């Protein structure tokens, strides 16, 4: 893991666990997210459209076995689902602003169920301009939600009602590569979801994107 991002992530975890450093921890979280966002934006400036569909590690195991377009989709679908359906209990940005049609996506899920050539085919269908609009909007809305949370809310568990709501939306595929996400998220408290979905998950997939980029443009 990138040393700078890793250190920031560790700092976030330490700071948000204590009430007297919680606000500082949220500031550190936003700093990390801004740094990672700069990398994701750089792809739009530096890469050709077809580069977003490239899958140079198609037979590998790991986050780098995807495409850059898929990775961006995946990061922000998960964030949107977790932030709105599970934490804020309101409508996802994806549905509120008609992003399935705007992005031209054949799916509404996180994409965990897709493999190999399916990932490439999926990536090629996406409207990148709208995909980037989506990520900006999700990032902003998530950060508004995080700012509204008090330290005491971090230990709040996800209710059974929320879990059933999540299932009913069909935003997580029933495929074995995806369905585990529902229990994984719903067994965490709000603090755990913030530390994974809004920070560490970003790091892992952004690093994978850089690995893909460096492979296709050595």
Predicted segments, located by residue:
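A structural signal for alpha-helix termini and helix-coil/disorder junctions
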Residues: 14, 18, 42, 46-49, ...
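Acidic, Ser/Thr/Gly/Pro-rich intrinsically disordered interaction regions
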Residues: 122-132, 151-165
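Alpha-helical packing segments of well-folded alpha/beta enzyme cores
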Residues: 25, 32-43, 78, 124-127, ...
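Terminal targeting/low-complexity segments that flank the catalytic cores of oxidoreductases
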Residues: 1-42
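A short, mixed-charge helix-start or loop-turn motif at secondary-structure junctions
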Residues: 22-26, 61, 120-125, 187-191
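Cytochrome P450 catalytic-domain helical core, especially the substrate-recognition surface
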Residues: 112-120
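Short, contiguous, well-structured surface segments enriched in hydrophobic/aromatic residues
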Residues: 35-51, 173-176
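Short, contiguous alpha-helical
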Residues: 1-11, 54-113, 140-143, 147, ...
